[in-house]
Amino acid sequence: MKTKLLLCIALMLVLNSVSLAQQRSSITLQSANLKPIAGSRTLTIDNMFFETANGRVDIPVLNLDASVGSIDVTAGGHKITVSVKPQARDFNVTFKAQPDSDITKWGLAINSSPTEYYTGLMERVVDGPQAKSWATGIQEAMNLRGQKVDMIIKPTTSIYAPYYLSSRGYAVLVNGNWPGYFDFAVSDPGRVKIEFEGPSFDLKIYTASDPAALVRAHAIDAGPPFMPPKWMFTPWRWRDEHTQRPTYYDGTPVTGPFNSEIMEDVLMMKAFGIPNGIYWIDRPWGPGKPWGYDDFDIDEQRLPNFAEMVKWLDAKQTKTVLWIAPFFQGKMMKEALDKGYTLAGQVRPVSGNNYPMVDLTNPAATAYWQDGIAKLLKLGVAGFKLDRAEEDIPETGPYKVFDGRTIRENRNAYPPMYVKAVYEVAKKFRGNDFFLMPRAAYTGSSPYSVFWGGDIGGTQEGLRASIIAIQRSAVMGYPNWGSDICGYNQQLLEQEVCGRWLAFGALNPIMEVGPTRNVAFWNLPREPTYDSQLIAIWRLYARLHERLIDYNYQYAQEATKTGMPIVRPLFLVDPAAPPAWSNWWTYQYGRDLLVSPIWEKGKRTQEVYFPAGSSWRDAWNPKKIYRGGQTFTVNADTYQLPLFIRVGAKVDLGDLNKEWKESVEIAGKKPDLKALDAELKRWWDTRRAGGGGQ
């Protein structure tokens, strides 16, 4: 049922002098969906201004008739058109100027109540250098109140959207790609301040009595989200670098035909009974130093018999995914520079990581770069990890890209263009049977890819940040997300942190298992080097994740059709309950599962709020049922993820206790790599002799 909306443009003038340019005004939006402040269900927009090189100019709005919805006023020598247009239960608010060539910024403020809650904007917990989001002792979580956020994509936890929702029943999306700034009641406790660069200013203000409706509406407007193939929801394995070694981790000579570390992983996982449907190969995989990314060619010394290896993995129901980046190396770099295919404003000559990036606004440059991607797709590669795009990218100076926009405007626009360019060529070769996974995102990215949480810290606070990031990403319209299990930066490989992270990862749409130091849980650079506990936990949760493939796929379809993410912060499912806004470490996973990951070392209990309207069965103790609408303390050993099934749901997670006992027993026995390697060698020799086989 559509909510009747009343639009009232209220004149609130504060006369500092007789000059019209110094008058202040406000726009008042009235909606039954808004929670009342002092008895009024209104949203007040004031402090409207624009800036030029000569400074700030306040905007007066006079006699704006609601039936017309717009008015022209003069301020600072400019004709300013202010427009407010109701759209069903929402509003579009726009500011335009004539002339606009000297306009550098626009701004406004929205009134805030003392306890109002805000979330969205970015996956990182707090703005600034990414390590602040996993600093020891960090207290900030989902709520952005009290934070200032620069809306410019920062490396390397880099999923952003200029969209936030409020607990008062509204949400704001700033359209466009220009950098901006949000101030959530920091400089003024009674206001949210929004400022964005650019010649015009365009906002959509959503209203709904249900926060989930705000999330759904924005996700569809900004998407709809990409629908991955079902196999994307299988467990993954990856390493940061692959070397070709003469022996396996235990000293067994390598006789098999492919990269030794890939063979080791595949053979060991098979022996342990750890399911794996995707093997992602990070850089370097090509010739050239230091990146191993020259000309989209495969380094046959590092990855011998690559095309045959892809077929071997395919026969094992394992897809091959490669790392890529939006720059040129090798012979392509010289040709791209000669033809003017690279971004203006980059430092030359090339130094550090400042490799020539493709100008994705130039069709010829894009096609030239896409030809490299096509070479890999022809080899059977089924997807790509899209790194970079937000790091070492020019953003200041008088430079313009091919289509005429400034490099400043190009800054946030680049990641969506990057993923779209890869999507176009992958779609041509593979139809719908592929996925892409960038680390950087902005509005416009979601129709083309799934996402991962960047180079997160490998500490307990890094796990904490990931629990927040997956929920923030869901709110922003990025439903399919995963993190580097055990972390990437500052990786300590602590047993308890890795174990808890494996458990958390199983209840993510993407479960991608490193760890990053080019090792596995059977040859760690600390004691125990062969960590049977982590191998057992990996097996337990990889098998659980495998059982959830159909469940994950079902909710990915729902996200694409309706905008509702599978990861649901509790305020999306039980917004009337105060604990749903404060118990940030617990989320609903689809309709039928509730998960409460533990991130702190030494912790063996968890406070869990159970959403009202249902009762919840303990996945570890099926006789234990918790009534919704209450908070309970639950026990959880180091291998146990607090996990609950909605009573009446048809979801089979298996016998987790039995699975754990089996996993411990299996992990305690080291596989015979000599026998496994010999089996693979026989298969290869038979295949080479023309005998076929898989």
Question: What positions do the PLM features span?
Answer:
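Generic short beta-strand
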Residues: 32-34, 41, 47-48, 71, ...
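Extended, loop-rich substrate-binding clefts of extracytoplasmic carbohydrate-active enzymes
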Residues: 52-98
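Catalytic and substrate-binding regions of extracellular carbohydrate-active enzymes
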Residues: 40-68, 665-676, 682-684
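Bacterial N-terminal signal peptides
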Residues: 8-16
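Catalytic-domain carbohydrate-binding cleft regions of carbohydrate-active enzymes
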Residues: 23-42, 74-76, 87-90, 98-647, ...
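Sec/Tat signal peptide C-region and signal peptidase I cleavage site
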Residues: 17-21
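Bacterial N-terminal signal peptides that target proteins for export
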Residues: 1-7
